[in-house]
Amino acid sequence: EERETIENGSNVASKSGFTGILLNSNTKPVADNQTDISFIKLKSKNSICNIYPLGALTISSKSVEMAELFDMKNSGAVGFYDYKKPILNSNLLKTSLLYSQSFDSVVMSFPMDQSIAKKGIINEGMISVSYGVKGIPNFSEEIQINRDLHILEYTGGKLHIPTISTKKSLDLIKKAKSKGLNVS
């Protein structure tokens, strides 16, 4: 198996018709500081397609302590996301949304309440039952989105929810947008 690099990732993206791609923060090491983002920007300077790095929202993507958001933004990060990991601490999301407004940046939040999802791997339903795999109840996603939108309504800022899988989740986001919240 070949290790993906910035160069070959850029080449594949370009051949697939993309002119720019987001680079998630789940690199090795996790891109959670100014040096990591500067390195990514330097290595991608001559790439065929534009690379837009995301910085980790928290140190080592552990959802404990906020990373150096302002410094990463100044080094070229376009947003902040602990790749496929929910923000467990509501106050951390609140603080991140408040702080990121001062430098016009976006916070991304993975929509899953882990205490409900546990070790599920697909949405709970007929397919999970027929394959005999642990399902994730829909409300695991919807509870997290609802919490995040309430916090966004309180703080303002920009919130991106990178994946949704239920109609109710979509309806929650539509309702928030109709209230003027900056959510995508």
Which role fits each region the language model picked out?
Residues E1-E4, S25, C49-E65, K84, ...:
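Active-site mouth loops of central-metabolism enzymes
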Residues E1-K45:
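Metal-associated gating/positioning segment near the N- to mid-region
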Residues T5, D32-D36, V64-E65, L92-L93, ...:
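Residues at alpha-helix caps and immediate loop-helix transition turns in enzyme cores, especially N-
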Residues S16, C49, S75:
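Structured loop/turn residues at beta-strand edges in well-structured enzyme cores
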Residues K28-D32, S60-S61, K85-L88, S165:
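Glycine-/small-residue-rich active-site loops that bind phosphorylated ligands and cofactors
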Residues Q34-L54, L98-M112:
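Alpha-helix-loop-beta-strand connector modules within alpha/beta enzyme cores
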Residues M66-S184:
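Histidine/acidic residue-rich metal-binding segments in metalloenzymes
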